[in-house]
Amino acid sequence: MSPSPSRGALSALLATILIWAYSWVVMKQVLAYAGPFHFAALRYLLGAAVLFAALLLSRQSLRPPPLLPTLLIGLCQTAAFQGLEQWALLDGGAGHVALLAYTMPFWAVLLAWLLLGDRPTARHWVGVGLAAIGLACIIEPWHDMGSALSTTLAIAGGAAWAAGTVLSKRMFHRHAPPVLNLTAWQMLLGGMALGLLALAVPERAIEWNLAFTAGLIYSVLLASSLAWWLWSIVLQRLSTTVASVSSLGVPIVSVLLAWLILHEQPSAMELVGIVFVLLGLLAVSGVGARRRG
């Protein structure tokens, strides 16, 4: 891998972490004004519209990538992941749900090994182990984890995202679709599935006000359209292990933002866990190894 693509992927990863970290706070706030499935469907259908507009403006092809794998990616990565996490946020704190959702890397590492032959190195296993210890310290499964339903939904959403991540990586390996094209089509298909779910599940009417509209705009333009496009770039250029474990930066920043904005104060154990996760990220990224080299 040349330095330039790698640097571009790392820049995309950093931007994605910052955008998604704040989006958990936004999602928690907007659910005071809308049901989880209606909001998720709106967010992703509008996000897909933005991406298709970007395709038109950049004069890229609107022809869909291979339909079945694109549909599977959309169902896992958009419909299942976002639907389950939005549902979990109804009873769970933003920081806590974000942390449970980011069990994703551990599922992704195993799925990538089984389905892609992307076998982790010894350094990767060390990083995964440190991050797992950190996540356990943050979640504290030996204590009351709050709503059992919220916890289960958040973890299931993380597993669905892992499946979408590995399927996306396999799509890039086998078919090499343009990143923006794949992101737009999987978001449209996943958003349509969320739309059908929103129609089938009775929910409160959306309360259209300034707070909801501002949250929806952030979610559509940044957290959906821009961030998922950047995430696809990351998956295209980095290994599944490095990309997925590095995404643990999102819940770390999310916990800190939830502390500052929603007053969900982290415990001492959560702060210890954050340190372990950061050590795991350093191990997986190989920063120290590159410097010694």
Predicted regions and their residues:
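Glycine-/small-residue-enriched transmembrane alpha-helix faces in small-molecule transporters
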Residues: M1-H38, H143-R170, M192-A193, R292-G293
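Specific transmembrane alpha-helical segments of multi-pass solute transporters/efflux pumps
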Residues: I19, S23-W24, F52-T103, L111, ...
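Small-residue-rich packing faces within the transmembrane alpha-helices of Major Facilitator Superfamily
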Residues: A21, L45-A49, A132, L188-M192, ...
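Hydrophobic/aromatic residues within transmembrane alpha-helices
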Residues: V30, F39, R43, A88, ...
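Specific alpha-helical transmembrane segments that line the substrate/conduction pathway
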Residues: H38-A49, Q77, Q82-R119, H124, ...
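Helix-helix packing/entry segments at the starts of transmembrane helices
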Residues: A40-L42, Q82, V97-T103, L167-G191, ...
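Transmembrane alpha-helical segments that form core, pore/gating elements
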Residues: L51, A108-L110, G146-P202, L216, ...
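Hydrophobic transmembrane alpha-helices of multi-pass small-molecule transport proteins
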Residues: L51, L111, P120-E140, G158-A159, ...
